[in-house]
Amino acid sequence: MLFTEEQLKLYSKPLSESEKEKCENAIRIIQESLESLGYETKKGIHRNNEDTLSYQIKMTNPSKDYELSIFVKGSYATNTNVRQNSDVDIAVVKESEFFDKYREGKTRENYKFVSSNKPPYHFKDEVEEALIERFGRSEVRRGNKAIRINGNTYRKETDCVPCFRYRDYSNDYMDDPNNFIGGITIYSDKGERIINYPEQHINNSVIKNNNTNYKYKKMVRIIKEIRYQLIDSKNENAKQTSSFGVEGLFWNIPDYKYSNDEMLGDTFNALIAFLIDNIDKLREFKEPNDILNLCDSQEKNNVYKNFILDVKNYFEYSGEKKYE
């Protein structure tokens, strides 16, 4: 398909101010819901990073002596979302409890940690109860990993993700309780433990964007829009490639590749050319958090390979007008 510079310029723009307001409202309503359970706001709504939409709130429950961190994660947090009808992901993190990992021969006893006496799903039950009380049963739907809150003209459709902290002590050789790689652990209703690193993702996207003279996020928005177009045309590889995944592909491209050309289309072609040249090295790529592998299976590796080839065949650039 032939794309003009003006089209790409449109795709590369961040969402409107009204979308930002709805995103902010989504986190605020979760804050208000948890107040009914006795939580108090310790630090009001603020941005975790001024260059993102990663709104955050800190709450505490004096009677239970623990804190919550509530923050926007995913593509809204990194400001790379491209379709207005997509939902916003909000993590509700219980800071006082964490899942852990240690190097061989070490256990929590070496760090003088104690086990929680509550099952992981108890916290999700508590959050769900607060949301139902605030919105009513018909507006709240519990899923395997998240609790969905229906959207309206005031707020975005929201996936509220109750979770715990994660601490990886694998590289600590001093039994130092503060020496860990931190993330979050989502405990699903099916008993799965999902570990990810949303805060590193947010911060790394800001660094990458700054290092590429703000071209990185523009290019990510363009590839995400093209992915949606391929999905609309029934492309199976695009369907199996997540929004986070295509962002990860572009995050692994060296910064200097973003500065070769002034035109959006020329820059995009240069990035796709790099992926084609390195298509057999995708197993070495990292997620934008720079911790987990982007392709953790041969199946995913094959999907990403085919997606890259499909984008190359789909994207044609007419060339015109330099962007500001």
Swiss-Prot record:
Which prosthetic group or cofactor does it need? Mg(2+)
The cofactor remark states: Binds 1 Mg(2+) ion per subunit.
Q: Summarize where Mg(2+) binds, as residue positions.
A: D87, D89, D159
Q: Is ATP-binding included in the keywords of this UniProt record?
A: yes
- Binding of GTP occurs at K224, S243
Q: What keywords would UniProt list here?
A: Antiviral defense, ATP-binding, GTP-binding, Host-virus interaction, Magnesium, Metal-binding, Nucleotide-binding, Nucleotidyltransferase, RNA-binding, Transferase
Q: Does the keyword Metal-binding apply?
A: yes
Which superkingdom? Bacteria
Question: What does UniProt list under activity regulation?
Answer: Activated by a virus-derived, approximately 400 nucleotide RNA (called CBASS-activating bacteriophage RNA, cabRNA) that begins in the viral terminase subunit terS and extends into terL. RNA secondary and/or tertiary structure, as well as viral infection itself, are important for CdnE activation. A much longer RNA (escaper RNA) with a different secondary structure, derived from a terS-mutated virus still binds to this protein, but does not activate its nucleotide cyclase activity.
GO term, biological process aspect, one: defense response to virus
The protein's GO terms of the molecular function aspect are: ATP binding; GTP binding; metal ion binding; nucleotidyltransferase activity; RNA binding
Enzyme Commission number: 2.7.7.-
Can you tell me which residues bind ATP? D89, N144, K145, D159
**Pfam families recorded for this chain?**
NTP_transf_2
Q: Which reaction does it catalyse?
A: GTP + ATP = 3',2'-cGAMP + 2 diphosphate
Among InterPro entries, the record links this protein to: NT_2-5OAS_ClassI-CCAase (IPR006116), NT_sf (IPR043519), Polymerase_NTP_transf_dom (IPR002934)
- Recorded family membership: Belongs to the CD-NTase family. E03 subfamily.
Main function? Cyclic nucleotide synthase (second messenger synthase) of a CBASS antivirus system. CBASS (cyclic oligonucleotide-based antiphage signaling system) provides immunity against bacteriophage. The CD-NTase protein synthesizes cyclic nucleotides in response to infection; these serve as specific second messenger signals. The signals activate a diverse range of effectors, leading to bacterial cell death and thus abortive phage infection. The effector for this system is downstream Cap15. A type I-B CBASS system. Cyclic dinucleotide synthase that catalyzes the synthesis of 3',2'-cyclic GMP-AMP (cGAMP) from GTP and ATP upon activation by viral-derived cabRNA. Binds cabRNA via positive charges in its N-terminus.
The protein, known as: Cyclic GMP-AMP synthase CdnE03
Q: Give the organism the record lists.
A: Staphylococcus schleiferi
